[in-house]
């Protein structure tokens, strides 16, 4: 990664990063050619001031009275965070081929996203031989060799909870840049900076904690106040 770009990325807060990625996702799907921060606010439910702040944090100055150029803004966000555009693909793998991992074997899920699954791994050798997939499936013992030969950058971890930590450590050691963790396991500090936790149970608990005690009619006010404070 370009060192100067990395320093600039670190100056953007984590909440802003998350919002900007979601914003780019929305922009990539809209049919509008231009859009104002007020219009964006009506779609994503953040304040227009917060949206302008986030956009300014990546150095994008393309906003005028009639709004932002949608394509330029979307491209600027993707470029700033080195997110793969749909026209190019970053290679990924699935680690853990149980029920959840098997559901992800449908590569159509990732069509047009800029990410491509090129390999699957599981500690159970029999499972890799029985399952059918559009991409090769390997025993977990082959992770190091395949990640290197295929130049895989990202991994989706869907293994058993007890296998998650050693598999995550192995992936990072092999050069994986980031892991989407679908397990309930809490991964160690050596890999935590490269992990996005996506366990449905963890997300539901986090959501429950966030909305606990918030009346439905006050939820929108509370959410905007929280984002404005970030």
What does each model-identified segment do?
Residues 21, 25-28, 38, 42, ...:
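Solvent-exposed alpha-helical segments within well-ordered globular domains of core cellular machineries
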Residues 85-127:
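Glycine-rich adenosine-cofactor-binding loop
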Residues 3-6, 82-89, 217-221:
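Intrinsically disordered, low-complexity coil segments
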Residues 44, 98, 184-187:
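Glycine-rich beta-alpha junction loops
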Residues 1-35:
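Extreme N-terminal segment that seeds HTH/winged-HTH DNA-binding domains in transcriptional regulators
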Residues 34, 38, 43, 47-92:
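HTH-adjacent hinge/linker in prokaryotic transcriptional regulators
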Residues 23-32, 130, 134-230:
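Phosphate-bearing ligand-interacting subdomains
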């Amino acid at each position: 990664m370009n060192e100067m770009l990395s320093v600039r990325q670190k100056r953007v807060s984590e909440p802003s990063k998350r919002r900007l990625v979601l914003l780019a996702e929305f922009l990539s799907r809209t049919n509008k050619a231009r859009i104002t921060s007020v219009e964006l606010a009506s779609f994503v439910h953040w304040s227009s001031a917060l949206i302008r702040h986030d956009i300014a944090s990546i150095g994008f100055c393309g906003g005028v009275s009639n709004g932002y150029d949608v394509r330029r803004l979307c491209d600027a966000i993707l470029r700033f965070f080195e997110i793969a555009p749909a026209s190019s693909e970053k290679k990924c793998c699935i680690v853990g081929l149980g029920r959840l991992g098997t559901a992800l074997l449908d590569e159509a899920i990732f069509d047009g996203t800029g990410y491509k699954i090129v390999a699957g791994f599981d500690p159970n050798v029999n499972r890799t031989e029985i399952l059918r997939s559009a991409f090769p499936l390997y025993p977990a013992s082959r992770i190091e060799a395949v990640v290197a030969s295929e130049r895989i950058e990202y991994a989706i971890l869907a293994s058993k909870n007890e296998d998650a930590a050693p598999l995550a450590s192995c992936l990072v050691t092999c050069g994986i840049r980031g892991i989407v963790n679908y397990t309930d396991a809490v991964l160690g500090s050596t890999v935590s900076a490269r992990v996005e936790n996506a366990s449905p149970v963890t997300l539901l608990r986090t959501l429950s904690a966030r909305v606990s005690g918030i009346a439905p009619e006050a939820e929108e006010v509370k959410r905007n106040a929280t984002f404005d404070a970030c």
